[in-house]
């Protein structure tokens, strides 16, 4: 019984063959990058949703402190008339900022006062709670 034959590269050098191999390699790399980006975006979106769910979990607490929660794709905002705590998820990292709305005369967006980063939703929630404790005595 003979071994299966493998298709071997052409015995003569061919620009066409080399070009087609290179094009296929680049296409495979592009597809792998796009898939990795898509998976990362899905993970970031899921983390934003988890944080949002944690923040809206106690509507009585939110109402007692005049807080609202908003979720926009990769960012979650915890707001009061005086400040905004924003958490933005990108590339597996949560960036949490707090901005003061009391002295916003020029811009509709409060300037960030503090910023921290977190690697997980529980850590992001802890930082949000810390910023909130700084703003609400």
Task: Show where each model-derived region lies.
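Charged, low-complexity eukaryotic segments
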Residues: 1-35
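Alpha-helix boundary/N-cap detector
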Residues: 10, 39, 43-46, 50, ...
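Contiguous, amphipathic alpha-helical segments that mediate oligomerization or scaffolding
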Residues: 22-66
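Amphipathic, interaction-prone secondary-structure segments
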Residues: 53, 57-100
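Intrinsically disordered, low-complexity regulatory segments enriched in Ser/Thr/Pro
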Residues: 82-124, 134-137
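C-terminal partner/receptor-binding element of secreted or periplasmic proteins
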Residues: 127-130
């Amino acid at each position: 019984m003979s071994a299966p034959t493998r298709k071997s590269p052409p015995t003569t050098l061919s620009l066409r063959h080399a070009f087609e191999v290179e094009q296929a390699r680049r296409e495979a790399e592009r597809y792998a990058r796009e898939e990795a980006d898509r998976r990362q975006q899905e993970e970031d979106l899921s983390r934003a949703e988890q944080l949002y769910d944690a923040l809206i979990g106690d509507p009585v607490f939110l109402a007692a402190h005049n807080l609202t929660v908003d979720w926009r794709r990769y960012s979650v905002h915890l707001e009061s008339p005086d400040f905004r705590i924003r958490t933005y998820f990108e590339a597996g990292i949560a960036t949490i900022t707090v901005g003061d709305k009391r002295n916003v005369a020029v811009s509709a967006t409060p300037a960030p006062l503090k910023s921290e980063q977190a690697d997980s939703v529980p850590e992001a929630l802890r930082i949000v709670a810390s910023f909130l404790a700084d703003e609400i005595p």
